[in-house]
Regions:
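Conserved MFS/SLC helix-loop-helix module at the cytosolic interface between two early adjacent transmembrane helices
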Residues: 66-102
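Helix-loop-helix hairpin linking two adjacent transmembrane segments in secondary transporters
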Residues: 135-137, 143-189
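C-terminal transmembrane helical hairpin of 12-TM major facilitator-type secondary transporters
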Residues: 277-322
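Helix-to-loop junctions at the C-terminal end of transmembrane segments
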Residues: 67-79, 263-275, 360
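Paired small-residue
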Residues: 94, 105-114, 302-310
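A late C-terminal transmembrane helix in Major Facilitator Superfamily
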Residues: 331-365, 372
Length: 391
């Protein structure tokens, strides 16, 4: 990439538009990630074990995957702003259902409904970010939008943990339902975006035929299973060995989110070096960090809080690599590809919650961390394969 391209800057209007998209991602990130610090209290209140809440989390992931698979061929023909606002409003209603759940079955149904809404929100948001930004700024634009995950962790998840201590986990869910409603209103204030030229109903085979897409989706599956498997059960593992409240999960999320957010300062390197060159090193470093998690947990919960900072930094680059590469293809197919990305992400979420939940219940957190590291090693190996890697 040329120095002139690297020197391009965001206009104030584009920055404001990306901020609204960041809020949408932050809302989804908050409701998806807040389960971790609340899991122990939710299980106790509903008289079930942690694995049952893990299965409910898995149904959330299944809901995202189903919605994204249904929406993926249509996202390039739908008015994205309207679809995004409606999905955020639906998310708010589903979160209210979580707050009112009388048992684990009702909670699982409400979480599945949250997933259906998120399955539209995520690909629509990523596709809009790709539409708004010029090619030379795309990695930086995507980096800004995915900072919503950092906002969710740095501010949202710790706040949810504190709310749970004051209002209970149900009160925390009720407050986040209101946040989803506010996010819907913010999206409605965006100017109507023009659909990419040639936007149409896109069959899956057309989206999957783009060079590199199938490989990247398999890498995404391994990558996301590693993250969600470790993150979902880490706090419960720590609380089982130390008598600490849900605020511990908030501290872990705060440290992770700070690392994830600070890493945005390095997103320009992805534009200059190219995402493929960053992929394998990032995945291998993450694999090493996964193996360190159970060792840190055995030492002290606060050792995990410290380790979460570099985890967040490296995970930012790994996620940006995947989203940037998948969103860099033909504009008229971008919505379909990002829909498939969201579907695969939350198939991984489902497998991590349901499948690795059984591993956690039977063999403990160390086994989960080893499986996560192995998945990341697979993703790194695929990134280094010599076949055509361009999307």
């Amino acid at each position: 990439m040329s120095e002139a391209a690297a020197a391009l800057r965001f206009t104030p209007a584009l920055s404001r538009q990306l901020l609204s998209l960041t809020l949408a991602i932050a809302t989804v990130g908050l409701q998806a990630l807040m389960v971790a610090p609340l899991l122990t209290d939710m299980a106790r209140d509903l008289a079930v074990g942690p694995a049952a809440i893990g299965r409910a989390v898995g149904l959330y992931g299944a809901g995202v995957a189903v919605a994204a698979l249904i929406a993926a061929p249509r996202l390039d023909a739908w008015p994205r702003r309207r679809a995004l606002a409606l999905a955020l409003a639906a998310l708010g209603l589903a979160l209210a259902g979580c707050a009112l759940a009388a048992d684990a079955v009702m909670l699982a149904v409400a979480m599945a409904a949250c997933g259906l809404a998120a399955g539209v929100i995520l690909p629509a948001t990523y596709a809009l970010a790709g539409d708004l930004a010029p090619q030379e700024l795309r990695s930086r634009a995507v980096g800004r939008v995915i900072v919503g995950w950092s906002v969710a962790m740095v501010l949202g998840v710790p706040a949810a943990a504190l709310l749970a201590e004051q209002l209970g986990w149900r009160g925390a869910y009720a407050v986040i339902a209101g946040v989803a409603g506010l996010a819907a209103l913010a999206v409605l204030r965006l100017p109507a975006a023009r659909q990419p030229e040639g936007a149409r109903l896109v069959p899956y085979r057309v989206a999957l035929a783009q060079p590199g897409v199938v490989r990247l989706l398999v890498m995404t599956l391994a990558y996301m299973m590693a993250f969600y498997g470790c993150y979902t059960f880490l706090t419960d593992h720590l609380r089982a060995t130390d008598d600490l409240g849900p605020s511990l999960g908030g501290w872990i999320s705060l440290s992770y989110g700070l690392g994830f957010g600070v890493a945005v300062l390095g997103d320009g390197l992805l534009d200059r070096w190219g995402p493929w060159r960053v992929a394998a090193p990032a995945f291998l470093v993450l694999a090493g960090l996964m193996l360190l998690l159970p060792l840190a947990a055995a030492e002290s919960p606060w050792a995990v809080v410290v380790l979460a900072l570099p985890w967040g930094v490296v995970n930012h680059f790994g996620l940006n690599v995947l989203v940037s590469l998948l969103s860099s293809g033909e504009p008229a197919l971008r919505g379909a590809v990002m829909g498939l990305y969201s579907a695969v992400t939350y198939i991984a979420h489902f497998l991590a919650g349901a499948g690795l939940g059984l591993v956690y219940a039977g063999a403990g957190f160390t086994a989960v961390a080893v499986i996560a590291a192995a998945g990341l090693a697979v993703a790194a190996t695929m990134a280094m394969l010599p076949a055509v890697r361009r999307v």
